[in-house]
Swiss-Prot record:
<keyword id="KW-0479">Metal-binding</keyword>
<keyword id="KW-0828">Tyrosine catabolism</keyword>
<dbReference type="GO" id="GO:0006559">
    <property type="term" value="P:L-phenylalanine catabolic process"/>
</dbReference>
<keyword id="KW-0560">Oxidoreductase</keyword>
<protein>
    <recommendedName>
        <fullName>4-hydroxyphenylpyruvate dioxygenase</fullName>
        <ecNumber>1.13.11.27</ecNumber>
    </recommendedName>
</protein>
<dbReference type="Pfam" id="PF00903">
    <property type="entry name" value="Glyoxalase"/>
</dbReference>
<dbReference type="InterPro" id="IPR029068">
    <property type="entry name" value="Glyas_Bleomycin-R_OHBP_Dase"/>
</dbReference>
<comment type="pathway">
    <text>Amino-acid degradation; L-phenylalanine degradation; acetoacetate and fumarate from L-phenylalanine: step 3/6.</text>
</comment>
<comment type="similarity">
    <text>Belongs to the 4HPPD family.</text>
</comment>
<dbReference type="InterPro" id="IPR004360">
    <property type="entry name" value="Glyas_Fos-R_dOase_dom"/>
</dbReference>
<feature type="binding site">
    <location>
        <position position="387"/>
    </location>
    <ligand>
        <name>Fe cation</name>
    </ligand>
</feature>
<dbReference type="InterPro" id="IPR041736">
    <property type="entry name" value="4OHPhenylPyrv_dOase_N"/>
</dbReference>
<dbReference type="GO" id="GO:0046872">
    <property type="term" value="F:metal ion binding"/>
</dbReference>
<dbReference type="GO" id="GO:0006572">
    <property type="term" value="P:tyrosine catabolic process"/>
</dbReference>
<feature type="binding site">
    <location>
        <position position="302"/>
    </location>
    <ligand>
        <name>Fe cation</name>
    </ligand>
</feature>
<dbReference type="InterPro" id="IPR005956">
    <property type="entry name" value="4OHPhenylPyrv_dOase"/>
</dbReference>
<feature type="binding site">
    <location>
        <position position="219"/>
    </location>
    <ligand>
        <name>Fe cation</name>
    </ligand>
</feature>
Length: 419
């Protein structure tokens, strides 16, 4: 199977409980509530203030909103940072759950969340906790998911404030300790969510740094343990009506030392795409195995951020201190020859030598091309990283670059003693 081929899931009929009709689980529109895209990604971290500053300084984002002691949140602090439609929320506990006074006036809900957050940090370190989808019908998506076996974390509820209106949200469990929030903000006019205060002042030093032209979240990748990929994909198909958009196996994603399998699940209207990876047998430990070991289980491996100008983006990030993986020059020697000899209906718009200098990779078919690059892991645990991606009439996921990318990652694994 071609790595860029769009593949279909087995066709399963489900009952639309609003109409009583049998509907195909791969239908793109029909009765399924629409997914509008990624709303935001929530990270649970040890120090939200420092994490927010890190992404502002290195990735060119800015603090947009805040929730903490000053807004009445007595046990948690959260910072919303973002650029255009990229939104990350960093949340930290600000009290110990084991040293609270016996007469502490804390709700049972906050006590349980405080305990869960500390346990999550001990198990995973700084990590993605939640990937939020904006949908047009929270109740409909939630009910269908739960009816199909999804674990409910929080049923639909409405949050509001007098000034900005209300949002509706619900939470379901996905792979590992990761969750999905389902959010509708049609009736909300504020910057983010009720309970957050807008932040309008930014450190003066940020204005001296090169701007980073990010646009939105392109996709979020989940790593699974051995033989767990298909169960994770089945969850998205069964519970959220996603379909299999794209897939490759270990015959196509392998190096001399390791291999993996990958399936991309997409929402019914294809606006949300969630690649799911698992390790495959190889001579040594794959990057997926390394992730699962240091993350203590399945979780979000990387978040791809879309840009319309990857050269400017990567150069700006590099000047700000972001570390990217290094690609051998032999890759570009081969790519230069291919671009000169292979038939296609497009011309590369970027300066090839600048792509080489910035270690940016190229994948393409006859109709278009993709440019991409991975950062090094963002934490001391070799777990989460960021991908920068630019699409030019190309909907694939860089299968042509997988071998080169993974060989580059393996070189760093070897330095860490984890290959």
């Amino acid at each position: 199977m071609s790595p860029s081929a769009i593949t279909e899931s087995p066709r399963n009929s489900v009952v639309d409980h609003t109409s009583g009709l049998q509907v195909d689980s791969l239908a793109v529109q029909g009765p399924f509530p629409s997914f509008h895209g990624y709303d935001h990604v929530t990270w649970w971290v040890g120090n939200a203030k420092q994490a927010a500053s890190y992404y502002n300084t290195l990735f060119g984002m800015k603090i947009i909103a805040y929730r903490g002691l000053e807004t009445g949140s007595r046990y948690f602090a959260s910072y919303l940072v973002g650029k255009e439609d990229v939104r990350f929320v960093f949340t930290s506990p600000i009290r110990s759950h084991v040293h609270l006074p016996e007469d502490e006036p804390i709700s049972d809900e906050d006590r349980a969340l405080l305990k869960e957050m500390h346990a999550h940090l001990e198990k995973h370190g700084d990590a993605v906790k939640d990937v939020c989808f904006e949908v047009d019908n929270v109740q409909g998506v939630y009910e269908r998911a739960v009816q199909q076996g999804a674990v409910s974390i929080a049923p639909p509820k409405t949050l509001s404030d007098k000034e900005h209106g209300s949002v509706t949200m619900a939470v379901i469990q996905t792979y590992g300790d990761t969750t999905h929030t389902l959010l509708s903000r049609d009736n909300f006019r504020g910057t983010f969510l009720p309970g957050f205060r807008d932040v309008n002042r930014q450190p003066a030093a940020y204005s001296a740094l090169a701007p980073v032209p990010l646009q939105r979240i392109d996709h979020c990748v989940g790593n699974q343990d051995w033989d767990d990929m298909r169960a994770a994909c089945d969850f998205y198909e069964r519970c959220l009506s996603f379909h299999r958009f794209w897939s490759v196996d270990d015959n196509q994603i392998s190096t001399d030392f390791s291999a993996l399998n990958s399936i991309v699940m997409a929402s019914p209207n294809n606006v949300v795409k969630m690649p799911i990876n698992e390790p495959a047998k190889g001579k040594k430990r794959s990057q997926i195995e390394e992730y699962v070991t240091f993350n203590s289980g399945a979780g979000v491996q990387h978040i791809a951020l879309l840009t319309s100008d990857i050269i400017t983006t990567v150069e700006a990030m590099r000047s700000r201190g972001v570390e990217f993986i290094e690609v051998p020059h032999t890759y570009y020697d081969t790519m230069r020859r291919r671009l000169k000899t292979e038939k296609r209906d497009w011309e590369l718009q970027e300066d090839f030598d600048r792509l080489v200098r910035n270690n940016i990779l190229i994948d393409y078919d006859e109709g278009g091309y993709l440019l991409q690059l991975f950062t090094r892991p963002l934490m001391d645990r070799p777990t989460v990283f960021i991908e920068i991606i630019q699409r030019n009439e190309f909907d694939g996921f860089g299968a042509g670059n997988f071998k080169s990318l993974f060989e580059a990652i393996e070189r760093e694994q070897a330095e860490r003693g984890n290959l």
